[in-house]
Design a protein with these regions (language model features):
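Membrane-water interface segments at the C-terminal ends of transmembrane alpha-helices
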Residues: 1-128, 156-177, 181-184, 196-229
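Short helix-to-coil transition segments within interhelical loops
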Residues: 65, 130, 136-157, 185
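Short alpha-helical segment that forms part of, or immediately flanks, the ligand-binding pocket
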Residues: 77, 135-136
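Intervening/peripheral non-core polypeptide segments
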Residues: 110, 118, 147, 151-152, ...
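Short, charged juxtamembrane terminal tails flanking transmembrane helices
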Residues: 230-236
Length: 236
């Protein structure tokens, strides 16, 4: 009975995907669709480079900080995670000024702000799985902090880092509210989906929606599966 209930629950969660097979007329690509894909993938990729470059040292610092300081930093990071996207977009526009709006820079900066908290918090959780004693021993053997990270810390925590990065990727790629305020142009996939829906209806949305889902969902799903497999291997 419990298995049947769980099956129904799972089907209910997946039910929205059935909308991809709804008969709404012939699908068609609209002008600017491919540009929206290029904008989203290219600028989100750049945003992720910045997130990793800034977020990894921050995660290392917070993970090794005294408990009280760690709590404070985690609270600060949670603010960036919990801040409503529309409010964040307005605040960024006010903070950076009107010249900032509707530029590639605005697009990337907004994506960094909406996603870096997810990456840092996930990376902190990954780093907490690394025994501190191993890092100390590596340091005593003469390895500098950079060498300790690459030889000891990262190999143990790499799947956790991958999960954190995949969550940040999805968060940045799918952001709509903040991007709508700060960078309506250049139009990425979320904004293009919305404008196509408003202007042309569902048939114009579905092709881009399929690409959107195909670029957003596989990475976190794969990272989660690999992390679970590794956990099961360690338990065995």
């Amino acid at each position: 009975m419990q298995r049947f209930g769980a099956l129904l629950f799972g089907l209910a969660l997946l039910f929205p995907l059935a909308g991809l097979f709804a008969r709404v007329g012939p699908w068609h690509w609209t002008n600017g669709t491919l540009d929206a894909v290029r904008v989203s993938l290219g600028l989100t990729g750049l945003a992720m480079v910045i997130v990793v470059a800034l977020g990894t040292p921050m995660a290392l610092y917070v993970a090794r900080a005294p408990s009280r300081e760690r709590i404070i930093w985690q609270a600060v990071l949670l603010v960036s995670v919990l801040l409503p996207p529309l409010a964040l977009g307005i605040l960024l526009s006010l903070a950076f000024g009107t010249r900032f709006s509707n530029t590639s820079l605005a697009f990337v900066v907004t994506q960094v702000y909406v996603s870096i908290g997810y990456y840092v918090l996930g990376a902190i959780a990954a780093l907490e799985t690394v025994p501190r004693s191993l890092e100390v021993q590596a340091g005593l053997l003469g390895h500098d902090p950079w060498s300790v990270f690459w030889r000891v810390t990262y190999p143990i925590a790499r799947l956790g880092f991958a999960v954190a990065l995949s969550l940040a990727w999805v968060r940045a790629l799918t952001e709509f509210g903040a991007i709508l305020v700060t960078a309506y142009y250049p139009a990425g996939m979320p904004v293009a989906i919305w404008t196509n829906l408003e202007n042309f209806g569902l048939p114009a949305v579905l092709p881009l929606l399929v690409v959107f889902l195909a670029t957003a969902l596989p990475l976190p799903w794969l990272a989660h599966v690999l992390a679970q497999r590794r956990a099961l291997t360690h338990r065995a």
